[in-house]
């Protein structure tokens, strides 16, 4: 869902002249400024070094639910794949901005009881220690708008069941909610402005809009 919203916003933004999408399957979108690469091995992006060279920003939107996964499998997707991409980008585009989708509740100490929070904390810390402009954004509940939909069935069911809560949460706990279009626009603003704060919650992101 986040990746689809991010792509749509990048294609809409007139200041963004070229968009490269790397995935295992096609996004099935046609646009003059879009280029797509289907890449089977997400643990090795070295063959894409020339494609990444000179990039201004990377919006890393890959994510997976921890439900039903052991820690090793979750770490492979959440941390190992992220760092595999980041290591190539930092070599060929060291002045670029890397914006990583993390999540509210991430544990920066890496020692908490929640497995997913620890692993995301490890990932954030590793990225922030790398010699480029890395940011971690921590959205909570994301309201899908503009036709954006999640591909995860139980997420979709959850959104249908709890969508009515969004206006309430927005008032009582603005830090915990954000719309998909707001998140995407804010991530673009992070890349443009390079704010001093490098870990951003939903309310921090809305302040950039």
What residue spans do the PLM features occupy?
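Conserved Rossmann-fold NAD(P)-dependent oxidoreductase catalytic core, especially the SDR/UDP-sugar
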Residues: 64, 72, 76-117, 121-122, ...
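Conserved short hydrophobic patches within well-ordered secondary structure
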Residues: 7, 11, 16-21, 81, ...
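Oxidoreductase cofactor-interface core, primarily capturing Rossmann-like NAD(P)-dependent enzymes
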Residues: 12-15, 32, 108-209
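N-terminal Rossmann/SDR dinucleotide-binding element
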Residues: 1-64, 183
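Rossmann-fold NAD(P)-dependent oxidoreductase module
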Residues: 5, 9-13, 84, 88, ...
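Short, flexible active-site loop motifs that bind/organize anionic cofactors or intermediates
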Residues: 6, 38, 72, 173, ...
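Active-site loop/turn elements of alpha/beta-hydrolase fold enzymes
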Residues: 24, 103, 139-142
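NAD(P)H-binding glycine-rich loop region in Rossmannoid oxidoreductase-like domains
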Residues: 35-84, 88-90, 107, 191
């Amino acid at each position: 869902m986040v990746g689809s919203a991010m792509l749509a916003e990048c294609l809409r933004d007139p200041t963004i002249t070229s968009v490269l999408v790397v995935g295992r399957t096609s996004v099935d979108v046609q646009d003059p400024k879009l280029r797509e690469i289907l890449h089977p091995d997400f643990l090795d992006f070295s063959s894409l070094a020339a494609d990444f060279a000179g990039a201004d920003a990377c919006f890393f939107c890959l994510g997976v639910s921890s439900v039903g996964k052991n820690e090793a499998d979750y770490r492979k997707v959440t941390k190992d794949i992220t760092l595999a991409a980041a290591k190539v980008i930092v070599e060929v585009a060291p002045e670029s901005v890397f914006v990583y989708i993390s999540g509210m509740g991430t544990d920066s100490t890496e020692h908490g009881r929640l497995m997913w929070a620890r692993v995301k904390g490890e990932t954030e810390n590793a990225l922030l220690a790398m010699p480029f402009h890395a940011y971690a954004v921590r959205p909570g509940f994301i309201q899908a708008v503009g036709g954006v939909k999640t591909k995860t069935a139980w997420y979709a069911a959850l959104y249908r069941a709890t969508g009515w809560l969004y206006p309430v949460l927005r008032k009582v706990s603005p830090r915990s909610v954000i719309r998909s279009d707001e998140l995407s626009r804010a991530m673009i603003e992070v890349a443009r402005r390079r704010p001093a704060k490098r870990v951003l919650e939903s309310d921090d992101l809305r302040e950039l809009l």
